[in-house]
Amino acid sequence: MEHKIVHVGDIPVANDKPFTLFAGMNVLESRDLAMQICEHYVKVTDKLGIPYVFKASFDKANRSSVHSYRGPGLEEGMKIFQELKETFGVKIITDVHTEAQAQPVADVVDVIQLPAFLARQTDLVEAMAKTGAVINVKKPQFMSPGQVGNIVEKFAECGNDKVILCERGSCHGYDNLVVDMLGFGVMKQASNGSPIIFDVTHSLQMRDPSGAASGGRREQTVELAKAGLATGIAGLFIEAHPNPDKARCDGPSALPLDKLEPFLAQMKALDDLIKSFAHIDIR
């Protein structure tokens, strides 16, 4: 199978290339915190030689509770992203939730993300495709790996073949997610070799049935990330925070920021090893 390359600026993202890190914070909590977190990521990834794209949301439109923090909104969010790009020279990925957001966001960031809950919404797909931006599709928790080909085809029919696919776990009963490691290979086949990245952070979510926000299992970040990279994929998607217990969204799944460098050092070593192996074709 041929591995498709999607370029994020000068970064080639593909399943047979060194892994790209799509990472940052869950939601923009403040300009200063975004600057702090982005600076740390840039410092660590530069040191380790890992291609990097900063991630944050400007509007968490899918929060469980109407009382939960959503973010600074479109206008302020784009100002923060622009400052991050100018200050650190970093690429940026963020999610959009409506057709009207697609072009204004694509005018600022490098990758626009289709949220898992909205992955079948054709009008949103069309609006995102028309921007010409690189697209990151979060595979829905309710969708089998083989069905992602339909989403890739939908974008292609709308004129955009610059699609990255993101695994983020599948529903396993109520309030739990599991990751099927066989699914990475199925997604590659179903999408004709599209780049696959692995959202480790959100795959670690575990909801409290009586709560208004997701719980998580961040203590298992390392083992899950290692398992995903061992399948030979294009990248990892993670979120970190200086104080995860105080994060305004998904703190229980977030990596403590001071663990970022040792975590990424191990991930790079594993990825380099896996991609040094010759492919064994078994039919």
Swiss-Prot record:
SUPFAM superfamilies noted in UniProt: Aldolase (SSF51569)
GO MF entries: 3-deoxy-8-phosphooctulonate synthase activity
Any one Gene Ontology cellular component term annotated for this protein: cytoplasm
Highest rank taxon of the organism: Bacteria
Major site of localization recorded for this protein: cytoplasm
Pfam families named in the record: DAHP_synth_1 (PF00793)
EC identifiers of the protein: 2.5.1.55
Keyword annotations from UniProtKB, A to Z: Cytoplasm, Lipopolysaccharide biosynthesis, Transferase
Subcellular location: Cytoplasm
Reaction catalyzed: D-arabinose 5-phosphate + phosphoenolpyruvate + H2O = 3-deoxy-alpha-D-manno-2-octulosonate-8-phosphate + phosphate
Annotated signal peptide: none
Gene3D superfamilies membership: Aldolase class I
Protein name as annotated: 2-dehydro-3-deoxyphosphooctonate aldolase
Taxonomic placement: Bacteria, Pseudomonadati, Pseudomonadota, Gammaproteobacteria, Vibrionales
Protein encoded by which gene: kdsA
